[in-house]
A protein has these predicted regions:
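Acidic, surface-exposed loops and disordered segments
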Residues: 1-251
């Protein structure tokens, strides 16, 4: 197997970090590589806050649900949906910019942020570092907006740790749903989705058991726990305060 493909297939979230320093030249290379990511209309509507100060990383951990593993990261990168840049560009030539005021525009920002997250983590992984995506930054968006002095049209959507991985005790990466219930030929297939869920429910349960964590929830239980409530209920109001809103008029 191609070495790059092998490395990508072995990717996993790494929460056990040694606390050792990420080399400055490696971090610069990660950022330079991630900046080459594909983005909609070359608008470059993401920005990053790179955090290395230990006290600030501690604050990030506390505001992200008190996740202890974040504190052991040498670097935390906050990924921002950033329409301030594009709005400045259009304002400077007397033009209109509706990117933060349409459903499609907001989706563009979210998609680009996801691509950026993947780019950062892939580059870090190639260099031997461990990462974990942190969606819980959306549990306290207004605190992060204040902490990072974010102007209107900029929003903290997801973050990632970067650090030197400790010895990984897990036998394998987490399994995934069956390929044929994930990648469909020509049309979506609800029956294959249902079949895949049933197969994966057993496989995921077995994986937890094999790795000595039988108390962890199954796939169905995880979905029930996470999505049985509106998890981060200040996202809408905090986005609106930052100038994001739907003003689409359908005709």
């Amino acid at each position: 197997m191609n070495e790059m493909i092998k490395k990508l297939q072995e990717r996993r979230s790494v929460r056990e970090l040694t606390g050792e320093k990420v080399k400055d030249e490696d971090l610069k290379l990660i950022l330079e590589t991630a900046q080459k990511y594909p983005n909609s209309v070359h608008g470059q509507q993401t920005s990053l806050i790179v955090i290395r100060d230990k006290e600030n990383i501690r604050k990030v951990a506390e505001l992200s649900g008190n996740q202890e593993h974040i504190k052991n990261a040498d670097v935390f990168i906050m990924i921002l949906v950033d329409f301030y840049r594009g709005k400045y560009a259009t304002d400077s030539i007397g033009a209109t910019n509706m990117s933060a005021e349409s459903a499609d525009g907001i989706l563009v920002g979210a998609v680009d942020a996801g691509i950026m997250l993947s780019s950062i983590q892939t580059a870090a992984g190639v260099l031997g570092y461990g990462t974990t995506a942190i969606g819980a930054v959306r549990s306290n968006p207004e605190k992060f907006i204040e902490m990072f002095n974010l102007p209107k049209y900029v929003y903290p959507i997801v973050g990632t740790t970067i650090g030197v991985p400790a010895k990984n005790e897990l036998k394998t990466s987490k399994p995934r749903i069956p390929l044929d219930s994930f990648a469909f030929d020509e049309k979506y297939d609800t029956e294959k989705v249902k079949e895949g869920v049933e197969v994966f429910e057993k496989e995921f349960r077995n994986w937890w058991d094999e790795n000595g964590m039988p108390e962890r929830p199954s796939y169905k239980e995880t979905n029930s726990i996470v999505y049985g409530i509106i998890r981060y209920n200040t996202v809408k109001s905090s986005m609106e305060k930052q100038g994001f809103k739907f003003t689409d008029n359908e005709e």
